[in-house]
Amino acid sequence: MQPNDITFFQRFQNDILTGRKTITIRDASESHFKAGDVLRVGRFEDDGYFCTIEVTGTSTVTLDTLNEKHAQQENMSLDELKRVIAEIYPNQMQFYVIDFKCL
């Protein structure tokens, strides 16, 4: 079985598959992805494969510069997005936005 290239929490799987979630915000450990990369996607909880995505763009962002567009692309409110990012990456301010589409 091929390993997954990137994982998402299971709660985001349906939003990814239906196109409601089109970005992911990651820390420096996942800043190496670039436009054109094709990635196998798995669930964080069990590493089970659920789709393949293509990276369509990347950019940097800070917790303070997250905006409504980021929130819409994550399919959540801006307050919820900031809370989720702060929970996943405590004490970090610099992040990497990965834009993607399901293949």
Curated annotation (Swiss-Prot):
Record flagged with keyword Ribosomal protein: no
The reaction(s) this protein catalyses: N(4)-acetylcytidine + H2O = cytidine + acetate + H(+); N(4)-acetyl-2'-deoxycytidine + H2O = 2'-deoxycytidine + acetate + H(+); N(4)-acetylcytosine + H2O = cytosine + acetate + H(+)
Disulfide cysteine pairs (residue numbers): none
Swiss-Prot/TrEMBL keywords: Hydrolase
Entry annotated with the keyword Thylakoid: no
Active site: 21, 24, 74
GO cellular component annotations of the record: cytosol
GO MF entries: hydrolase activity, acting on carbon-nitrogen (but not peptide) bonds, in linear amidines; N4-acetylcytidine amidohydrolase activity
Similarity section: Belongs to the N(4)-acetylcytidine amidohydrolase family.
Protein role: Catalyzes the hydrolysis of N(4)-acetylcytidine (ac4C).
HAMAP family according to UniProt: ac4C_amidohydr
NCBIfam families from the UniProt entry: PRK04980.1
Protein name: N(4)-acetylcytidine amidohydrolase
Native organism: Salmonella arizonae (strain ATCC BAA-731 / CDC346-86 / RSK2980)
Gene this protein is translated from: yqfB
